[in-house]
Amino acid sequence: MDARPLSSACVLAVLLSVAACTAAPERRNWFNDPFAQATLGLPGCPVPEEPLYTEAEMRAQAHYRAERGTSCWLAGTCPDSNAYRRDPETNARVVAAVRAAQTFDDTSVWVSTQRRFVYLQGCVRSAAQRDALSALARAQEGVELVIDDLMVGTEGKPPYTVAH
């Protein structure tokens, strides 16, 4: 009996086991942070990664998020004891406003919201367009702060993590 097929199978099994043990930890959107594409009018724009975390990162953020989500309510600046609870509707409101404006049809923009903080990521054609987009987002109900991670054009390194 030839032992080569058996030894090849054993080597393959060991290699697959090692690969499984060294694989990167799973990353997912543990907190269900809303993330949506508002426009897709600028070809070649680097696509941002949605808010993904490893389980360890999620555990590290859980206490901070609970504290941060309650602190604005205690300070009287949030209408809800959990500032994250209304993020989906806030995110949807910002996306709808961007789409309704029609002046941003030539941009590629994604919107994410975490505790009333709105993140704008993607590409615009000019600094004036970027400023107008930030102002539009800031004017929406439920938005406390806008973090502008937009780039003018599509060239260069984006100020956000790119999806793989």
Can you name each region flagged by the protein language model?
Residues 2-15, 21-164:
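N-terminal targeting leaders
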